[in-house]
Amino acid sequence: LIQTGWGPYSSFLNNLAFARFASYDLSVIPLFILMGHFATQGGISKALFQFAASVMGRFKGGLAMAAVLASAAFGSICGSSVATAATITGVALPEMKRHGYSGRLSTGTLAAGGTLGILIPPSVPLVIYAILTEQNIAKLFAAAMVPGLIAMLGYMIAIAIYVRVVPG
C-alpha cells in the first residue's frame, strides 16, 4: 500500500462494480419498465380492472377483490410494486368511490394489492437479488409464484370477511 498507493485498489473496485452490474441479465429491468409503460398507455390496466370487476362483481366487496386481482395481473406485467399500486389505484379508486366503498377499504385494498407486484413474477427485485446472489432467475420466479397467488387469495378472503363483518 505504501509503495503502490490506492491506484490498484480503486481500479479493482471500479472493475468489480462494473462487472457486477454490466451483466446481460440486468437488461431485463428496463424492458419490464417499458412493458409496464406500454400496458399503462395502451389501456391494459383499465381493461384488466374491468375484466376483474366483471368476474368478481357478483360477490359482496367485488370491486375491492377485483382491485386485488387486477393488481396481481398488472404486477405480472410490469414487475414493480410502486408501478402496480399507482396504476391500479388510478383506475380502481374512482370506481370504488363511485360505488360507495369506504375510503379505508378502498385505500387499504389498493395498498395491499400493490405489494403483489413484487411477489408475482416477473419481479424487478427478484432479478436484482438473483444477479447479486448468483441464483437461477427462473427458479426464483417459480418459487415466488405460489406465495404471490396465496397472498392474492388471502387478500380476497380478508376482503370477503371484512365486508361481512364491518357494516357499510
Question: What residue spans do the PLM features occupy?
Answer:
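Alpha-helical transmembrane segments of multi-pass membrane transport proteins
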Residues: 1-168
